């Protein structure tokens, strides 16, 4: 794919327009876009300074953000302008000299790359990545979580861009293929999962927890807390917001909003509800995904704006 022509002849396309066009073509998309002049970053909507500048010649590194002043400090990670951020190779070989580590993120499966400070899964495949994710990404199974685990009553917001889901020999097509948000991540076996775009067009809120009477490191089981039908369009940007708060009166409350509309709103009062702080993150299955503007901050647990829930929303 060739990069989109610059509007007006000399003006470079915005990074959002360029990445949108690039992600929309699978294997060659971003490779083609990289042949173009690097676009200037768009001014962020909140008026703050844009993210990291071009990566140094010896490889990309994340811009150093000030250490948070304390628990529940807002989380606004800054990605490098280009290149690999971290991957499952670094997770499984933390002491390897060629492992790429991130101060903010852990990837337990797949690869996290950056393009003009956007996060990107790369083109998903079913093979394990090497130290630089040069030949394979492994991102048909993409698991991204924060190093921080102090997110209690929290609202997570970001913009996401997803291509239609595919399949690999390792990962055949499943109804749940798509994009998911994690809240109160305690481990790979204990978390809240908010599915914002699944292959089957559903949005679903689940709690994952260790199987009763089984070892804690054994694959956990899911309990569905809420579900509705709300299929976001592929190949375009969408704003997602997930919140978790409580317990209050013995209940943990979780909501999912898409493009400003509440689509799931549920209370978890099961004895296995997750009441303590944890990490936040993103999960992808058989899906190429990009994201930007990822933030996590305090959430009071108040009712969302008076917008009608999606049809079939579980309260």
Regions found by a protein language model. Give the residues of each.
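N-terminal secretory signal peptides
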Residues: 1-13, 24-28
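N-terminal export leaders
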Residues: 14-19
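Extracellular carbohydrate-recognition regions
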Residues: 62-109, 116, 305-313
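Short carbohydrate-recognition loop motifs
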Residues: 100-142
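Secretory/extracellular carbohydrate-interaction modules
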Residues: 129-213
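Short tryptophan-centered beta-strand motifs in secreted/extracellular beta-sheet-rich domains
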Residues: 156-158, 235-247, 252-256
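Short, aromatic/His-centered strand-loop micro-motif at the edge of beta-sheets
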Residues: 213-239
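Flexible glycan-contacting loops in extracellular carbohydrate-active proteins
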Residues: 266-293
């Amino acid at each position: 794919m060739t990069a989109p022509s610059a509007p007006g002849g000399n003006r470079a396309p915005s990074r959002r327009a360029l990445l949108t066009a690039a992600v929309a073509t699978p294997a060659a998309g971003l490779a083609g876009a990289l042949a173009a002049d690097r676009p200037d970053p768009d001014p962020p909507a909140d008026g703050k300074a844009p993210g990291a500048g071009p990566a140094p010649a010896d490889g990309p590194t994340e811009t150093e953000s000030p250490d948070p002043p304390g628990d529940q400090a807002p989380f606004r990670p800054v990605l490098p302008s280009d290149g690999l951020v971290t991957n499952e190779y670094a997770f499984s070989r933390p002491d390897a000299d060629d492992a790429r580590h991130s101060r903010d993120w852990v990837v337990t499966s797949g690869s996290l790359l950056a393009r003009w400070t956007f996060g990107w899964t790369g083109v998903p495949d079913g093979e394990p990545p090497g130290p630089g994710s040069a030949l394979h990404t492994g991102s048909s199974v993409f698991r991204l979580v924060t190093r921080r685990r102090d997110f209690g009553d929290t609202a997570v917001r970001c913009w996401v861009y997803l291509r239609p889901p595919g399949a690999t020999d390792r990962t055949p097509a499943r109804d749940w293929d798509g994009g998911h948000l994690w809240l109160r991540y305690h481990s790979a076996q204990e978390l809240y999962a908010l599915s914002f775009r699944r292959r089957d067009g559903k949005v679903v809120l689940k709690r994952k927890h260790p199987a009763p009477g089984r070892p804690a490191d054994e694959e956990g089981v899911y309990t569905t807390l809420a579900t509705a039908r709300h299929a976001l369009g592929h190949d375009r940007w969408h704003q997602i917001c997930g919140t978790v708060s409580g317990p209050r009166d013995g209940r943990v409350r979780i909501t999912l909003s898409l493009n400003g509309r509440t689509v799931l709103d549920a209370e978890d009062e099961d004895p296995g509800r997750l009441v303590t702080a944890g990490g936040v993150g993103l999960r992808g299955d058989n899906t190429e995904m990009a994201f930007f503007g990822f933030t996590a901050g305090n959430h009071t647990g108040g009712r969302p704006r008076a917008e009608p829930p999606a049809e079939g929303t579980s309260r």
